[in-house]
Amino acid sequence: MHFSKKCSVFKVVLSALLIVALLQLLYLSFLSKLHGKQQRYKYSELFGSKKNANQGEKNPRREHLRYSLSTGGIFDGSGQYRVYKNLIKSDFSTNQKPGADPRSHHLALATHTTINNLHHLESLLERWKNPISVAIFANGEDVKFATAIIYALSLFCPQVQALVDFHLVCHSGEMATFPDQDREHFVGLQEMGCPAVFAKLESHRDKYKNYAIGSNVSYPNNLLRNVARGGTDAAYILVIDIDMIPSANLHHQFVTMLMKREPAADEVLVLPAFEIRHIRKMPASKPELVQLYQVGEVRPFYDELCSRCQAPTNYSLWVNLASKSSGPLEVSYTINWVDPWEPFYIGARSVPLYDESFRQYGFNRISQACELHIAGYRFSVVSNAFLLHKGFKVQGEFHSRKDEENRKNRILFRSFKESLKAKYPTSPRRC
């Protein structure tokens, strides 16, 4: 009898525990469904679902993205790449009046990148604070991620929304699609905002080395430069790599200079390019830069890899020139182009485009500088502005096929120089 009572009590306790466990499971299931419903609701707010497509106020940014993607983009001249121009437009570009004088939009910055380097946009925009046109190359699964992250940047980052135009380039056999099903890319972003989007980009920075995107995948750097250039209506454009930063107030200095004099039709304004150790804070002015230059923390761009490629800039002369950090840009001296100089410059939008047959590593920028020279341009070096590359360029950091690509593009460059003779038959200049 005593044993029977014990057994009954045990059954009651066990039953109670089972009921409690079952209730906990039901509660957790309910919470999970509720969380999923909340996430779906938040996601539908971002991208819109078929159910709520006609309800409430439309998101013009989302609708523009949908339209841009629905066009399927356009093929480049080679037919190997698909280009989505103005995938997302900035508020600045959207508010530009059709037919407005391009001089009212004086200077824009054009740049190019893959997803693994797009995180540099944050510091670039923080320094530049003016219109930027960004051409992004994506391959494979990155096409879907790039589309999603571009939209997130434009949605959650006010400065990006205000000033950055995005263009997307992928292989012709791939297509960008609206990120309806990509919830995993956006979990938590709405609550945490812009810092979370750039943190997500940071997690992709080591996905692959520059130019080592995948087997049989060529980074079309000159196509991207042209897409970024063509994506702005500015009268003048500065084309740089996304891991470079201009000196502070460059845009204001240039606009102030225009009040006194415009560059001649055959003139580009060269910005001396430097590179700095990763651990250093980025100098904003020439005095700050020169101080670091004198102690070896800053050196000419490509100093270790190809000192001849930037030597014509005449860094020793430039460093010792007295100049004002504020006020208009000042032209200090003019240089005739010599091989193999690869200057970075501010040029009119009429400057010849980059030759898009150059891809991967080698001769992609020098080919365009060579054409400027043959076309009769002069290179005027400014004394109070500069560009800075993040980190020293060293031999060991490059991908394994760099030398092979360089040899291939050297052969292409020889052919390109011959074609310039036919394009500019009356020019006495040669590269």
Curated annotation (Swiss-Prot):
Residues listed as glycosylation sites in the UniProt record: 216, 314
Disruption outcome: Muscular defects and reduced alpha-dystroglycan (dag1) glycosylation.
Signal peptide bounds: none
Membrane topology field: Single-pass type II membrane protein
Lumenal topological segments: 33-431
Cofactor(s) needed: Mn(2+)
Predominant cellular place of this UniProt entry's protein: Golgi
GO terms for biological process, alphabetical: muscle cell development; protein glycosylation; protein O-linked mannosylation
EC number: 2.4.1.-
Amino-acid positions noted as binding Mn(2+) in the UniProt annotation, renumbered to this chain: 241, 243
GO molecular function: glucuronosyltransferase activity; metal ion binding
Keyword field contains Cell membrane: no
Pathway the protein contributes to: Protein modification; protein glycosylation
Membrane topology, Cytoplasmic segments: 1-11
Transmembrane residue ranges: 12-32
Localization annotation: Golgi apparatus membrane
Keywords per UniProt: Glycoprotein, Glycosyltransferase, Golgi apparatus, Manganese, Membrane, Metal-binding, Signal-anchor, Transferase, Transmembrane, Transmembrane helix
Gene Ontology cellular-component terms listed: Golgi apparatus; Golgi membrane
Pfam families per UniProt: Glyco_transf_49
Reactions it catalyzes: 3-O-[beta-D-Xyl-(1->4)-Rib-ol-P-Rib-ol-P-3-beta-D-GalNAc-(1->3)-beta-D-GlcNAc-(1->4)-(O-6-P-alpha-D-Man)]-Thr-[protein] + UDP-alpha-D-glucuronate = 3-O-[beta-D-GlcA-(1->3)-beta-D-Xyl-(1->4)-Rib-ol-P-Rib-ol-P-3-beta-D-GalNAc-(1->3)-beta-D-GlcNAc-(1->4)-(O-6-P-alpha-D-Man)]-Thr-[protein] + UDP + H(+)
Protein family according to the UniProt entry: Belongs to the glycosyltransferase 49 family.
Function statement: Beta-1,4-glucuronyltransferase involved in O-mannosylation of alpha-dystroglycan (DAG1). Transfers a glucuronic acid (GlcA) residue onto a xylose (Xyl) acceptor to produce the glucuronyl-beta-1,4-xylose-beta disaccharide primer, which is further elongated by LARGE, during synthesis of phosphorylated O-mannosyl glycan. Phosphorylated O-mannosyl glycan is a carbohydrate structure present in alpha-dystroglycan (DAG1), which is required for binding laminin G-like domain-containing extracellular proteins with high affinity.
Name of this chain's protein: Beta-1,4-glucuronyltransferase 1
Taxonomic path: Eukaryota, Metazoa, Chordata, Craniata, Vertebrata
